[in-house]
Amino acid sequence: HGGKIITTKGRPIRLATPDRCKPYYSGKVVGVGESIGTVYALLGEGIIPSMQCVDIFLENMHDFKAYEKAVEKHYKVYAKVFNFVRAKIHHDFSFLKALPDFLSIFRYMKKNEDRFGMHIKMADLMKVAKA
């Protein structure tokens, strides 16, 4: 887009990805969406991932173990995003150490550009890594 970063502002967001929110169910009570960590930590966006989680639940509402497994598969990259964001927050980020996860995050975002509503460029993600 040709713009430049003037300043960055941040607000606290809950960083708990689905892999850190188990169990997703207890008896007949089932967690869905943001209650089980379906927030994309890099953007703080949770509405669309939560609606996707509802679809996963509806497909598996008669088998909670299958639901848990499907959620784990669908949101697998979220753990990598969590690790990336946490390392940046704690000033413990090493690009070389994070490279495999960084590439996975880029591929995921590139594949889902329509969902994110933006063109994903490696150069822009690199700016985030360097910030």
Question: Where do the PLM segments sit?
Answer:
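FAD/FMN-dependent oxidoreductases across multiple families
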Residues: 1-62, 66
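C-terminal helical "tail/cap" subdomain of flavin- and related membrane-associated enzymes
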Residues: 59-131
